[in-house]
Structure formats: structure tokens, C-alpha cells
Amino acid sequence: MKDTIVAQATPIGRGGVGILRISGPLAQEVAKEVLGKELKPRLANYLPFKDQDGTVLDQGIALFFKAPNSFTGEDVLELQGHGGQVILDILLKRILTIKGIRIARAGEFSEQAFLNDKLDLAQAEAIADLIDATSEQAARSALKSLQGEFSNKINQLVDSVIYLRTYVEAAIDFPDEEIDFLADGKIEGHLNDIIRQLNGVRKEAKQGAILREGMKVVIAGRPNAGKSSLLNALAGREAAIVTNIAGTTRDVLREHIHIDGMPLHIIDTAGLREASDEVEKIGIQRAWDEIEQADHVLLMIDSTEQTAEAFKTEWADFLAKLPQNIPVTVIRNKVDLSGEAEGLQELDGFTLIRLSAQTKVGVDLLREHLKKSMGYQSSTEGGFLARRRHLQALETAAEHLERGHIQLTQFFAGELLAEELRMVQNALSEITGQFTSDDLLGNIFSSFCIGK
């Protein structure tokens, strides 16, 4: 017989209500032993919870959900009693005296829901993300993922890939006409539509991953431009040593902050210049390592040393070396000394913010700009939440689509195109759990709460 599992569904500690959840074929047996009666599905019962000798341990609401009409898809019993931890522990101990009942693993209720097709893997992950959300925007986005918005987009992509794959494989079955099929433009048109569709989902997923995991913001610039002062201003504390000596920061400094609940990882780096000191050279190389992995770069410029219009010329080598997909915000610091007014403007394709890290004038403008860059919205609108593994799967799918496009347009190789489309389908299906290893499932659900 399949295991019946039990766990506390409410947080450990003192509260108004405490809930124990039981799922599995023995759920009704628990009701008979602890409550003294079988329960009708979906009907709330106010009953005493009894020990083996009939002693009343607590009293409260009991709810029974008959399979498959429950969260896990199994028979489920919920006992809602008083929220004292001692009471809940006594009741849990009582339930575990019943043969065939064991404590649930972390995330096992959600895992059973996934295995019983009550929700897919992306939706299951969204449960944990909703619980862990640190902002209203992240919570709303996690809820959209739980309701299937992300999964629906993936399923639409998979359906499009299957349709095209079927069309291509049908052409392969008629070798005399295969070239005509592959060259008539219809397959390439469908393939281009899938590529555009996938790129749109990738863009949304990247924004969703930033909402969940935080945006990595690297502060870069020349020595003494005020990078460490800006880190301190954003952190709201003296996280970095600040002096007038150029090159004070020689290693990477990291600070984790929240802006209206939105997580950011702020990284202060060594000043970029030609250095003769070996230690400083190492610091500069580490700075570049961080820059190349950034989600956003803040380029600090001393407003007392050059005009705003000159930055593209002065920083041409830096901009050329920077990966093209990383957004850059130019920060003109020390406006308290240069006499410039605080403000934000668009200049030559870059956002430029004038501020003083020392006096904190204009720092709020930067905070609002970073929130916007992360996808913050004060309304109820917004996208779904995503994880890094989702981004990796989407990236893998995009790579196979690109290879498939080459096989089609350059070689008219139907069999190789069909194989690339199969790989695309597998990569996308990993997101929803249609093709997923047991090891991956274990890693995902082990990060959940006990009782979920």
C-alpha cells in the first residue's frame, strides 16, 4: 500500500490555529481513530481529537477531501486545532501511533500533487516562491505562475514545436519530395514564428528570475569616483571603507539590499585604471569578472572631471569590452561639488543620473530607476516568476532552434532539423516536468517547507 504521510501545515511556534495535514489511503482511518467517525467529503466537522484511551487532546475543525478531489490527488484529512506547539506535537505523536503513517518529507505534499497531475513542476515551484516572496510584485508574479500563466506559454511553445516536427518528419517519409517540402518557405516561416515566440518568453522569464532571485548590480568606474560611497548610500550603512586615497577598494565588496521588497545584490569593485601594483591588478581583473556576469552596471563618473557629453569618448574602451546584453546606467556623481542639479535623463542611448553619493541627493532617483529595471509595477499587472533552471532550459531550446534553422536554410537537412526540434521539445518539457530526472525532482521538492 502507498504511504500515508502527515505533517504540520502551519508554521512551527505559537499561533491562533494549528493545522495537521494527512494525505494517503489511510487518511479516513486516521479520522476513525482520532475523531471516532468517518467523515463525509468537504464537510466541516467540529469534533474532539482523542488519544488511544479516549482522552481528549484538543478539539477543532476536521475536513476530509476524497481522492482525486484534493490538493495532492489522494485522500486528505486536515485537523485544525489550537495553535500551541505542544498541543500540535501531542496530536502529531498520536497520529504516528497508527500503523502505516509516517512523517512527510519536505515538499512531499506538493510532490504528490505533481506526481498525480494536479499541477505541473513550474506550478509546484511557484508554491514555494509564493511563500518566499519578499515583495507584493513577487507574490503576484508567483501567483500567476501557480495559476499556470508560465506553464501555458511553455505548453503553447511545445505544441508549436510538435506541429512543426510532425510536418518535417512527414516530409522525410517522402524523400523524392523532401527538398521541395523544406524549401517552400512554410517550414522556415513556422520555425521563425517559434523563435520569435521563444524569445518573448525568454525575456519575460529573465525578468521573472530577477524578481525572484534579485538583480546583480555592479558599480564600476575609475578610482575615487565615489563607488564605495554609493554602495554605502544604497545599503544605508557604512558597508565599505571610504577615503580620498585612490585605489582604497582593491577587492570585491557585496551588499544585499531590498528596495520596496525587491532584492538587489550590489557589488562594489576596484577602480578601473592601468595599475602597476600586483594586488590592484588582481582587484581590477575581479572587477571585470563581476561586470561580465552582471544584470546591470552602474558606471560611476566624477562630474567634476568631465562633461556629460564626453563620457562615450572617455569610456569607449570600457563600453566596447562590455557584453552587449548588459544594460548600463551612467552615474554622474559629486553634483554637490560640480554644481549640477540632480536629475535623470536619456543621453545617447544611455540613462544618465546626476546625484551625490556623499549627500545622498538624487539617490532616490537611482532607487526608483533600479526598481523599474527589475520590472517593479505598483499596479496588479506583471509577469510570471521564473527560476534559473527555467532560464537554462529556455536557453538550451533557443540554441537548438538556431542549429535547426541552419540545418534547414543552409543544408535542407530534414532529419537533422527534426532531431533539433526533438531536443527543443525535451528542453521545454523539463520546465513543466514532462521530461525530468528523479534527481532534479528531489532537489526541487527538498527545498519546500515540511507540510507543503
UniProtKB/Swiss-Prot annotation:
Chain positions recorded as K(+) binding sites: 224, 243, 245, 248
PANTHER family registered for this protein in UniProt: TRNA MODIFICATION GTPASE GTPBP3 (PTHR42714), TRNA MODIFICATION GTPASE GTPBP3, MITOCHONDRIAL (PTHR42714:SF2)
Domain TrmE-type G: 214-375
Alphabetically ordered keywords of this record: Cytoplasm, GTP-binding, Hydrolase, Magnesium, Metal-binding, Nucleotide-binding, Potassium, tRNA processing
Organism ancestry: Bacteria, Pseudomonadati, Pseudomonadota, Gammaproteobacteria, Pasteurellales
Enzyme Commission number(s) of this protein: 3.6.-.-
UniProt organism field: Actinobacillus pleuropneumoniae serotype 3 (strain JL03)
Protein name, per record: tRNA modification GTPase MnmE
Class of this enzyme: hydrolase
Alphabetized Pfam families for the sequence: MMR_HSR1, MnmE_helical, TrmE_N
A GO molecular-function descriptor: metal ion binding
Coiled-coil spans in chain: none
Subunit composition and interactions: Homodimer. Heterotetramer of two MnmE and two MnmG subunits.
Gene Ontology terms: cellular component: cytosol
Primary gene name: mnmE
